[in-house]
Amino acid sequence: MVNQSSTPGFLLLGFSEHPGLERTLFVVVLTSYLLTLVGNTLIILLSALDPKLHSPMYFFLSNLSFLDLCFTTSCVPQMLVNLWGPKKTISFLDCSVQIFIFLSLGTTECILLTVMAFDRYVAVCQPLHYATIIHPRLCWQLASVAWVIGLVESVVQTPSTLHLPFCPDRQVDDFVCEVPALIRLSCEDTSYNEIQVAVASVFILVVPLSLILVSYGAITWAVLRINSAKGRRKAFGTCSSHLTVVTLFYSSVIAVYLQPKNPYAQERGKFFGLFYAVGTPSLNPLIYTLRNKEVTRAFRRLLGKEMGLTQS
């Protein structure tokens, strides 16, 4: 095994062969990051400060917003430095931290999105028992389970990836330190790591996504049985935002972690990795707020209070 502590780190290639594209991506990534900071911070503040948003749905949403803030902050600053300047290296320690955070928070988001689907299932299919089933204690327990599973997954998979003997050039064909990219960088047999990724993908991607699809199948069946068109629109409206987020997140993560072994898929995987690391966290607040009248009204109430305090 190579002594990784004595190595200078890795070279993140990204799109270094296209300098013009890197400048464009710098603007896109910076804009997305600023939107992520503002949008997700606003959702957390509204969920905490507005009593009308003190419900399980917004508790889970604020968890998702906090998770997205941490997720993007773990990689975007380094990514911006690499996109803007000639220096595209990352130290072994920074790469290790980045992988650990990526795995932990990515896994947590997979589980949390499943929990949110369960919350919507109970709200639509068992409305009379919703308050009894989804009580505050259960909310905290489910959120804690999501975070713990993410931590355990990262503790298990990060060391086995970082202890691989890497090729001397240490050129990572990606924007960030991702597990698939580092496995491809190894000069020796990586069958164990590939099996580990495949097994983890089943439990973290396939199983949660299947549960989400089952939940939304039951939700769709229940909504179609509602007699009034207004009731159907309201029920679908509360679930469409979450389903959109699930589609964007899972499609991009699956494209990165379950991609076939060919150069085209790997090149495409870089774009998908960039999208789920930067794009989805910036879009989530917009998706959840644009069609959500409760959040819009909460923002107006908060803005009205601030205006009143300023005038007084």
Swiss-Prot record:
Q: Which Pfam families match?
A: 7tm_4
User: Any keyword Flavoprotein?
Assistant: no
One example of a Gene Ontology biological process annotation: mating
Alphabetic keyword roster: Cell membrane, Disulfide bond, G-protein coupled receptor, Glycoprotein, Membrane, Olfaction, Receptor, Sensory transduction, Transducer, Transmembrane, Transmembrane helix
Kindly state one GO CC term assigned in the UniProt record: plasma membrane
Q: What is its main location?
A: membrane
List the SUPFAM superfamilies: Family A G protein-coupled receptor-like
Can you tell me which family this protein belongs to? Answer: Belongs to the G-protein coupled receptor 1 family.
Write the protein's name.
Olfactory receptor 2H2
Query: What species is this protein from?
Result: Homo sapiens
